[in-house]
Amino acid sequence: SRGLGDVYKRQFQEYEDIDFIRDQIKEDLVSGAEKNGVKVLTMVDVGWVYWFTTNTIHTPKDLKEQKIWTWAGDYKTAKLWDEAGFNPIPLAVPDVHSSLQTGLVNAMPFPPLYVAANQYFGITKNMLNMKWGILTAALVIDLKVWNRIKPKYQKVMMKVSEEIGLEYQLNNRKEEDEAVNVMKNYGLQVNNLSKEQINEWNVLVESMYPLIPVSYTHLTLPTTSSV
């Protein structure tokens, strides 16, 4: 699932905020999945998404000059980028590495752990030091299969799935910074932004809200949280 990442680009910057918001919209996401024939056993974040690029970028204008990888089959996201003035290139994940090598794409939003594991950083040598969004994943099972499972076993499966998901999430959160440091040792350039440049990105995201078919931008964080 990429729902949280699509809805909340740049809006929240702490894991506590993401946990709060996910709790608020989880029921909608789960029911939406069931309408599409799948049962969600657990839902966790995979990590913060950053921009990894072949060329150095600092502003949305810089990104508009790049060729952005988007998920193959995710036509809504590709259309969103296109309408915002960017150059999306839909590709299947297995084609990302070869497409980076040939220059078909040269910009991609991914969590650092994923970039490190696939060694994309050998080509995309620049990371924009800005949390772009959160990548969310879910463990699912076909709803018809789920409905054939006895309730007592369903309960056990849900419990085990939640425990495994939480452990996976905690490990990812701990190892994220380590992945960036490892890539820096191999030549990754982490590019910081000025306040003015950060504001440009925030303005861009706000301008894209009307283009998003389903939005939860009315939700707010509790006053004790920091943004």
Tell what function each PLM region has:
Residues E16-V30:
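A gly/proline- and charged-residue-enriched helix-loop-helix capping module
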Residues S1-E16, S31-L219:
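N-terminal secretory/targeting leader peptides
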Residues I21-D23, L100, P222:
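A generic signature of intrinsically disordered, low-complexity regions enriched in glycine/proline
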Residues T220-V227:
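A short, hydrophobic C-terminal helix/tail in secreted or cell-surface proteins
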